[in-house]
């Protein structure tokens, strides 16, 4: 009863927002469209994106600008949830916000390291970050090099890990992105132990643990298949956290003498038994499927909990990814059938409890 009282307001809000998510028939329509303008006009009729698209000049109807609209809709949803949240729910949303911050910093790192002639295109994010983050976009967009960028993060939690990398003499984009990822996931792994209810801690542990495990597996696989890296070098790439992988399994995977042996050992782990990796090891796509399953089960079992918030934001992000994918399919001239293969949610290969 206490949870029902605490979450009744925000759960009602989430239910109203969930009703605005695109339905399977919407994806059928998107897949049938021939131009980016067709998709924009279709989204213009939706409640989630219409109010942002109507503010656009039709001369700006192209892929880059519509992707900004999608992100603005996500930020708008976050803002609505924050307004309805109590103090503990706000604390969770503040922690959730860090994923948007990390994405922003990663984008800026890539612009700086690639010496891109394309200027920082972040003005559409500025109002949101000014309100919910210590990161100052108006400073970041003036960064000319990595020293400027790191210094502009001085009043944020990201300064320390990136400053340490700078002082170490590391000089590649990969070094900085790795430092950012290691900091983020290690910090989030600690945050899951915070002052949350037991069921919320369980959900956060399962969701984050699966992400870390699968990200590590993805990096191990790529390091072996594409870069032929040795075990000591692979260890330096990995997040030093295991959830469903034992220490011995983790060691065996890293030290597998070949890609074929890695696949064999992978299929003996929890994830291999659950998802039955075939010849093509598609760990990245499995990651999204696994997290969605965990959050869906958590929400189904405990609708009056943080799962209601986290699952909705996950579904919103997945929706944006699918719309972006539809735009990409148009760019490459894919047929309706081919596009639908990317957009339509695949049948879950694993049911039951996410444990």
Q: Residue spans of the language-model regions?
A:
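N-terminal domain-start signal
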Residues: 1-355
């Amino acid at each position: 009863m206490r949870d029902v009282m605490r979450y009744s307001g925000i759960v009602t809000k989430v239910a109203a927002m969930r009703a605005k998510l695109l339905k399977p028939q919407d994806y059928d329509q998107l897949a049938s469209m021939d131009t980016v303008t067709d998709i924009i006009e279709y989204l213009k009729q939706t409640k989630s994106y219409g109010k942002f698209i109507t503010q656009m000049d039709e001369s700006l109807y192209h892929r880059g600008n519509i992707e900004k609209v999608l992100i603005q809709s996500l930020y708008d949803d976050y803002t609505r949830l924050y307004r309805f949240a109590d103090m503990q729910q706000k604390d969770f949303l503040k922690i959730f916000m860090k994923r948007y911050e990390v994405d922003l910093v990663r984008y800026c790192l890539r612009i700086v390291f690639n010496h891109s002639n394309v200027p920082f295109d972040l003005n559409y994010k500025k109002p949101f970050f000014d309100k919910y983050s210590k990161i100052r976009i108006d400073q970041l967009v003036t960064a000319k090099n990595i020293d400027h960028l790191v210094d502009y993060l001085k009043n944020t939690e990201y300064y320390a890990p990136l400053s340490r990398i700078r002082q170490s003499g590391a000089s590649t984009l990969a070094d900085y992105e790795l430092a950012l990822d290691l900091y983020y996931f290690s910090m989030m792994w600690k945050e899951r132990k915070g002052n949350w209810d037991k069921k919320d801690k369980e959900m956060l542990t399962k969701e984050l643990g699966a992400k870390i495990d699968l990200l590590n597996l993805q990096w191990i696989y790529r390091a072996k298949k594409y870069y032929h890296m040795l075990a000591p070098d692979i260890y330096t790439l990995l997040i030093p956290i295991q959830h469903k992988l034992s220490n011995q399994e983790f060691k065996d995977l890293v030290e597998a003498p070949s890609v074929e042996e890695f696949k064999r050992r992978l299929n003996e782990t929890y994830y291999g038994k659950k998802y039955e990796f075939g010849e093509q090891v598609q760990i990245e796509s499995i990651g999204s499927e696994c997290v969605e399953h965990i959050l869906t089960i958590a929400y189904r079992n405990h609708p009056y909990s943080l799962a209601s918030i986290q699952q909705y934001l996950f579904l919103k992000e997945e929706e944006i990814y699918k719309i972006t994918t539809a735009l990409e399919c148009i760019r490459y001239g894919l047929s309706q059938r081919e596009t639908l293969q990317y957009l339509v949610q695949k049948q879950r290969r694993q049911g039951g409890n996410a444990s």
